[in-house]
Amino acid sequence: MSSSPDSPPILHRLPRVAIIGAGRVGSTLAQRIAEKNLADVVLLDIVEGMPQGLALDLLEARGIELHNRQIIGTNNYADTSGSQIVVITAGFPRKPGMSRDDLLRTNAKIVVEAAKQAIAYSPCAIFIVVTNPLDVMTYLAWEATGLPRNRIMGMAGVLDSARFETFIALELGVLPADVKAMVLGSHGDLMVPLSRHATVNGIPITELLDAATIERLVERTRNGGAEIVELMQTGGAFFAPASATSLMVESILLNQSRLLPVSVYLQGEYGLKDVVIGVPCRLGLNGIESVIELNLSDSEREALQTSAQSVQKNIERWHSTQHS
């Protein structure tokens, strides 16, 4: 329906993504989103000058990268107002010898505060949590915002699946894009790589690799983040996590309905309730359009339940510190 001459003009603002935390993951994600021409970006951090400097650096690359996306650096949550997607990457990274769970106490307060501030300015946004320990942080952000579960999720399974696919491709000497695999469960030592569903151009890897080799690749996937931390010594991975997050952002903003493993609040699926854990979901304009229940084997289902129990224990651990 066309508007009358006296009615106000209808403004179609470009989509905006707010990234809370301008560290290596956050700043690389800002670059990915802008250069894929997905949305304007607001990069927020508590360190004065840092997000502003990063935003200016990214702006100066626009002519070279052939896009015209706006990139704002700020220390003020008001500048994130009206974002379609909020990504929380703020928090301390792992150091050598640390597990993701070791970050619980330090990062929980950061994520809860970031979620509360961001939702106040973007009440209709979809939230993606990246901060570790991922599944617990996503649960706490869900509690802090009161959002329906379709609008809050964690990025873990996309990254873990990409690592599994990479290691399979390296072992077989094939193109990574030809490998399809899925990793469920928590983002940690108890993740559940689904080996029997992994394929190379439709051929199950069980027909290409022996059981011992597959188990070795599964273990390397479980330790994929720690391997990078040990090598770098000064932080963790950021290129692949940023790419994994940008894929989720793309599927939502472009309504691609991609089937991706993401951490989501479960309400009985897989026999699990009141826990956030990685399972296959379809991502579109509404965030999580649907949760997909796979027909897992007994051992896979048991591994997923063990993974969920670990997440629940950490949630309870955090809650106990708040009431003590």
UniProtKB/Swiss-Prot annotation:
Q: Which GO terms describe its molecular function?
A: L-lactate dehydrogenase activity; L-malate dehydrogenase (NAD+) activity
Q: Where's the active site on this chain?
A: 187 (proton acceptor)
Give the catalytic activity.
Answer: (S)-malate + NAD(+) = oxaloacetate + NADH + H(+)
Q: Which residues bind substrate?
A: 94, 100, 132, 163
Q: Which Pfam families match?
A: Ldh_1_C, Ldh_1_N
Q: Which GO terms describe its biological process?
A: lactate metabolic process; tricarboxylic acid cycle
Q: Which UniProt keywords apply?
A: NAD, Oxidoreductase, Tricarboxylic acid cycle
What Enzyme Commission number(s) apply to this enzyme? 1.1.1.37
Residue positions binding NAD(+)? 21-26, 45, 107, 130-132
Keyword Oxidoreductase on this protein?
Answer: yes
- NCBIfam families referenced in this protein's UniProt entry, alphabetically: MalateDH_bact, PRK06223.1
Biological role stated in the UniProt entry: Catalyzes the reversible oxidation of malate to oxaloacetate.
Stated family: Belongs to the LDH/MDH superfamily. MDH type 3 family.
- Protein name, as recorded: Malate dehydrogenase
- Per the record, the gene is mdh
